[in-house]
C-alpha cells in the first residue's frame, strides 16, 4: 500500500511540472544562466567578501562581457547591546543587508530588484583581540549567508526567464 502511495505521489509531482532547480547539473539551464552573471566590485571589506562569495556560488569569473550584471549595495551595522553595571557592552549585533538588482546587460532592463540580509550576535569579552576576531568571523559568515540568499533569488528569476522587476 505504501509503495502504491509513493508511486501515485511521484506521478502527481511529475504531471505538475515540478522539477529540481538545478536539473542537469553544470549543464542545466540555471547553471548556464548563473555563469553568465557578472558581479562588479562592491565597496569595502564586506563588499569584497560578498562579491567573492557570489562569484564562487555563481560559477563565474566576474567577467564584464556577461549577459547579466548583478549590482549590489551593502549596509553593514555593528551595534552594542546588553549594557553591564559598569556601562560596558556585553554583546553586539552585526547586521549585513544587501539591496541588489539583476540587470540585463543587453537592454538595461532590471530583471530583479530585491534585498537580502542576516544578523549575528557577538559576545564582547575582556580580550579586545578576541572581540575583533569574533566580529570579523561574524562578518565572514554573514557575507556567505547573504550571498546564498542572493543566488537563490537570482536562480529563481533566471529559471523563470521573467523580464520584469520583482521584489
Provide a role label for each language-model segment:
Residues 31-42, 127-130:
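Acidic/histidine-rich, surface-exposed loop or edge segments in extracytoplasmic proteins
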Residues 10-33:
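Bacterial Sec signal peptide processing site at the extreme N-terminus
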Residues 43, 47, 51, 91-92, ...:
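Solvent-exposed, acidic/flexible segments
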Residues 61-67, 71-115, 121-137:
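Surface-exposed short loop/turn segments
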Residues 1-8:
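N-terminal export leaders
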Amino acid at each position: 500500500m505504501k509503495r502504491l502511495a509513493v508511486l501515485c505521489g511521484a506521478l502527481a509531482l511529475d504531471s505538475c511540472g515540478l522539477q529540481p532547480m538545478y536539473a542537469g547539473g553544470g549543464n542545466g539551464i540555471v547553471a548556464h544562466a548563473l555563469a553568465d552573471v557578472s558581479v562588479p566590485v562592491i565597496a569595502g571589506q564586506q563588499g569584497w567578501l560578498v562579491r567573492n562569495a557570489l562569484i564562487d556560488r555563481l560559477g563565474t569569473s566576474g567577467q564584464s562581457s556577461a549577459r547579466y550584471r548583478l549590482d549590489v549595495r551593502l549596509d553593514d551595522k555593528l551595534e552594542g547591546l546588553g549594557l553591564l553595571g559598569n556601562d560596558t557592552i556585553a554583546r553586539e549585533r552585526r547586521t549585513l543587508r544587501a539591496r541588489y538588482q539583476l540587470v540585463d546587460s543587453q537592454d538595461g532592463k532590471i530583471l530583479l530588484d530585491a534585498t537580502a540580509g542576516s544578523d549575528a550576535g557577538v559576545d564582547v569579552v575582556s580580550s579586545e583581540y578576541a572581540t575583533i576576531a569574533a566580529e570579523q568571523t561574524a562578518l565572514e559568515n554573514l557575507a556567505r549567508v547573504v550571498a546564498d540568499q542572493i543566488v537563490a533569488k537570482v536562480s529563481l528569476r533566471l529559471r523563470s526567464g521573467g523580464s520584469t522587476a520583482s521584489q
